[in-house]
Amino acid sequence: MNTISLNELDSENTFYHFTSRDNHESISLNGLIPSIGDNANGIEKTSKVFFSKGNIGFLRICDVWINWFIYRISLYNSVLKYKDITKEERMNLKRKFREDFTNGLYYTEDNINYAIAWMIEYMKSNIVLKLDITSEEYDPFDTDEAKSHEKEEFTNRMYLGYITSSDKVESFNMHTKSGVGVDKNKISKVTTNDDDSALSILKEIYKEEKDKDNGLEFAFLDRFMNYVNSMDENIKL
C-alpha cells in the first residue's frame, strides 16, 4: 500500500477512511470490502465502505464517535447490564433510555471521561486511509439509512446537530454505493512525520483547522483534544 503525507492532501476534498491497524495487510491485498458494521445491523440494509470528506468531516466524525461511546457506556449501565429481566422489561428500559439520551441526560462527567479514554485507545489502534474514488463509486446525495430508520430527534442527538438533510448522507458520514468496495490501487495510508496512528493524524488536522478558525467548536472533541494535549505536555516534563 502506498503512503502519503498529510501535508500533501487537499484539506477540503480528501476522502478519509478509518480502519484498525490489524486490517492493513488484508486491505493491501484485497482493497476495502463493503460490509455492514457491527453497530449497524438492523439499520443499514446493504454493505458499503464509509468515509469522511475533508478535514472538517474528519473532525466531526471523531466528535460523533465520542458521543457514540457515551451512548454505548450509558446503554450498558442503564439496560444491558441487567441480565435477569424479561424481554418486555428490557424493551421498556431501552425505550426510556433512548428518550433520556435524546434529552441529553447521560452527559455526566464519568460517562464523558470514560468515552474520552475509550476514544484515545480506539484512535491509537486505528490508521487513516485516503480513498481515490470517483462519482462512479459513490453518490454525494445518497440516502443515509440510519436517518430513515430512526426518529429525527434521536438522529440529531447522535449526530450532534451536524445535520443538513433529513435523509441524505452528511460529509462526515459518506459511503460508497451499495455493494461497492474500493480497489487496493485507490487506497493510500496517511502519515504525519512518519507516524501513521489515527490519533497523530487527528492532532495535526485539529491544530490546522483551529489555526484557520479559532471560533471552530465541537461538542466533545475540544475537551478530548485538551486532555490529549495535556498528556503530551506531561510526557515532555
State each model region's role.
Residues M1-F50, G57-N103:
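ADP-ribose/NAD+-binding catalytic cleft of ART/PARP-like enzymes
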Residues I73, N77-L237:
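Active-site and NAD+-binding cores of ADP-ribose-processing enzymes
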